[in-house]
């Protein structure tokens, strides 16, 4: 059985968009190009109708072969696909209907009934071992996730902070980091204050000793 096919033709931009105007084109050239485009569209429509007539006469019944028609049965442009016409407001008679709620519910019941068999197929020790295994991260240059007991031993001076819980939100994380930095700055200020006081005391002691020595040497 012969198959009627229409040759693919590239539509010029001026035809697909009548308001398009090339650079340096006059009004007369634009009108001439639009007239040529209208003639091209008419010729294309005539060729499409001829192909559709040829396909009907040869008895093509393949629903995958479609030809463009000017208007569907309801007056809107669409595609003729076999004996079914698809338009913006039309529906094909051969389209399958959506599944009914009863069928969807039956599928859910079937899936739920397989749950015990799936649980029985997986050994219980495997499930318990996977649940008890600590969370680790592949060593790709990033620090591993630390547990609650290991977080205290982590070097906080490195400036890296990790969430200690999967349930920690961003605001909680920011507040925790802020409190940690505030404690660090407070300890630093206290250490600097103590060091300054000690330095002053040492300088006073040295100056007193030097003064006593000079008073004894030069009475």
UniProtKB/Swiss-Prot annotation:
<keyword id="KW-0261">Viral envelope protein</keyword>
<feature type="modified residue" description="Phosphoserine; by host CK2">
    <location>
        <position position="163"/>
    </location>
</feature>
<comment type="similarity">
    <text>Belongs to the alphaherpesvirinae envelope protein US9 family.</text>
</comment>
<keyword id="KW-1043">Host membrane</keyword>
<comment type="function">
    <text>Essential for the anterograde spread of the infection throughout the host nervous system. Together with the gE/gI heterodimer, US9 is involved in the sorting and transport of viral structural components toward axon tips.</text>
</comment>
<dbReference type="InterPro" id="IPR009278">
    <property type="entry name" value="Herpes_US9"/>
</dbReference>
<keyword id="KW-0472">Membrane</keyword>
<keyword id="KW-1032">Host cell membrane</keyword>
<dbReference type="GO" id="GO:0055036">
    <property type="term" value="C:virion membrane"/>
</dbReference>
<dbReference type="Pfam" id="PF06072">
    <property type="entry name" value="Herpes_US9"/>
</dbReference>
<dbReference type="GO" id="GO:0043657">
    <property type="term" value="C:host cell"/>
</dbReference>
<keyword id="KW-1040">Host Golgi apparatus</keyword>
<keyword id="KW-1133">Transmembrane helix</keyword>
<protein>
    <recommendedName>
        <fullName>Envelope protein US9 homolog</fullName>
    </recommendedName>
</protein>
<dbReference type="GO" id="GO:0016020">
    <property type="term" value="C:membrane"/>
</dbReference>
<dbReference type="GO" id="GO:0020002">
    <property type="term" value="C:host cell plasma membrane"/>
</dbReference>
<feature type="region of interest" description="Acidic">
    <location>
        <begin position="153"/>
        <end position="168"/>
    </location>
</feature>
<dbReference type="GO" id="GO:0044178">
    <property type="term" value="C:host cell Golgi membrane"/>
</dbReference>
<keyword id="KW-0812">Transmembrane</keyword>
<keyword id="KW-0735">Signal-anchor</keyword>
<dbReference type="GO" id="GO:0075733">
    <property type="term" value="P:intracellular transport of virus"/>
</dbReference>
<feature type="topological domain" description="Virion surface">
    <location>
        <begin position="215"/>
        <end position="219"/>
    </location>
</feature>
<dbReference type="GO" id="GO:0044171">
    <property type="term" value="C:host cell smooth endoplasmic reticulum membrane"/>
</dbReference>
<feature type="transmembrane region" description="Helical; Signal-anchor for type II membrane protein">
    <location>
        <begin position="194"/>
        <end position="214"/>
    </location>
</feature>
<dbReference type="GO" id="GO:0019031">
    <property type="term" value="C:viral envelope"/>
</dbReference>
<feature type="short sequence motif" description="Di-leucine internalization motif">
    <location>
        <begin position="145"/>
        <end position="146"/>
    </location>
</feature>
<keyword id="KW-0946">Virion</keyword>
<keyword id="KW-1038">Host endoplasmic reticulum</keyword>
<keyword id="KW-0597">Phosphoprotein</keyword>
<feature type="topological domain" description="Intravirion">
    <location>
        <begin position="1"/>
        <end position="193"/>
    </location>
</feature>
<feature type="modified residue" description="Phosphoserine; by host CK2">
    <location>
        <position position="165"/>
    </location>
</feature>
């Amino acid at each position: 059985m012969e198959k009627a096919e229409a040759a693919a033709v590239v539509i010029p931009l001026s035809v697909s968009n009548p308001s398009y105007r090339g650079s340096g084109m006059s009004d007369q050239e634009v009108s001439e190009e639009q007239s040529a485009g209208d003639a091209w569209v008419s010729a294309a429509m005539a060729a499409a109708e001829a192909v559709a007539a040829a396909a009907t006469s040869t008895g093509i019944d393949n629903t995958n072969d479609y030809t463009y028609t000017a208007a569907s049965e309801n007056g809107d442009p669409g595609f003729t696909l076999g004996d079914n016409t698809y338009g913006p407001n039309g529906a094909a008679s051969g389209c399958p209907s959506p599944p009914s709620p009863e069928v969807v519910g039956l599928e859910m019941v079937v899936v739920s009934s397989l749950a015990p068999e799936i649980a029985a197929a997986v050994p219980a020790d495997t499930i318990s071992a996977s649940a008890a295994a600590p969370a680790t991260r592949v060593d790709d240059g990033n620090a591993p996730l630390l547990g609650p007991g290991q977080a205290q031993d982590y070097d906080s001076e490195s400036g890296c902070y990790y969430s200690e819980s999967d349930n920690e939100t961003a605001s909680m994380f920011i507040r925790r980091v802020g409190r940690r930095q505030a404690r660090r700055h407070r300890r630093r200020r206290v250490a600097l204050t103590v060091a300054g006081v000690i330095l002053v005391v040492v300088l006073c002691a040295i100056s007193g000793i030097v003064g006593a020595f000079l008073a004894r040497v030069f009475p």
